[in-house]
């Protein structure tokens, strides 16, 4: 696990927790500081909070591609990308950048992420962020959290940030995503769930292909989140919400009943 920062961080955090239970307080800070070295992870954020470190995230404004010193135009796909930028064909531009993702070198990746950011290509941006990590680059935190151009057909009824968090986790903003269990689109909605939860007549009457429409997918996903938030076993708790969304409210209740938390809070 020496190259796996995420597991190192979670391991360090729980080591600190173990030392706290043992009363070995001199060891706690060492392991919390080690966990905090990965501030983009869940356990890294928890470690920073416990240490009392106010780690400010710089949400840098969009930057423009430097066309006078562009490495990307020197690769075969470069001219096609330049043309697509000029005519503003965002969908085709995204496909082209994703297509060259496997051959990106460091400089091409840096320029590609600028294009993705400027055109709000959230799925592409996350793929390139992963590539930059492979190159060992220190990626600015804000690049891990792109925003989507899509919104629910009937508008946002819940916080926009909440839906973005679920899109990020469920599909990485990939509108064509489909799981082995049949969950579809940005919010990875199961057709059976859509039929159960939706108030939309066209969704009830249509086959699952309607969920490939990102605005309808977000509409149904938002309705399901609203339904779950009001359940007694969720009680507007975000951790329980995420559990119920992925595993179902029935499983959430079962796990709550069966879990011995052993005073862990």
Model feature map: region roles:
Residues 9, 13, 74-79:
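Alpha-helical tetratricopeptide repeat
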């Amino acid at each position: 696990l020496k190259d796996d920062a995420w597991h190192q961080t979670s391991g360090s955090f729980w080591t600190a927790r173990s030392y706290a239970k043992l009363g070995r307080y001199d060891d706690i800070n060492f392991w919390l500081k080690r966990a905090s070295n990965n501030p983009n992870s869940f356990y890294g954020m928890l470690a920073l909070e416990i240490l009392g470190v106010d780690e400010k995230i710089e949400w840098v404004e969009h930057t423009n591609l430097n066309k006078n010193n562009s490495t990307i135009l020197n690769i075969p796909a470069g001219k096609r990308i330049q043309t697509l930028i000029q005519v503003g064909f965002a969908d085709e531009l995204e496909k082209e950048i994703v297509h060259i993702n496997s051959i990106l070198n460091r400089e091409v990746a840096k320029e590609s992420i600028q294009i993705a950011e400027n055109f709000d290509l959230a799925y592409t941006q996350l793929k390139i962020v992963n590539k930059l990590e492979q190159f060992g680059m220190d990626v600015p935190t804000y690049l891990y959290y792109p925003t989507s151009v899509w919104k629910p057909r009937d508008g946002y009824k819940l916080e926009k940030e909440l839906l973005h968090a679920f899109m990020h986790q469920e599909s990485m903003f990939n509108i064509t995503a489909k799981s082995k269990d049949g969950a579809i689109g940005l919010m990875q909605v199961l057709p059976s769930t859509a039929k159960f939860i939706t108030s939309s007549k066209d969704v009830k009457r249509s086959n699952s292909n309607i969920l490939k429409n990102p605005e309808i997918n977000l509409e149904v996903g938002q309705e399901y989140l609203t339904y779950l938030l009001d359940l007694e076993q969720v009680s507007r708790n975000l951790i329980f919400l995420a559990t119920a969304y992925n595993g179902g409210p029935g499983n959430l209740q079962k796990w709550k009943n069966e879990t011995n938390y052993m005073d862990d809070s």
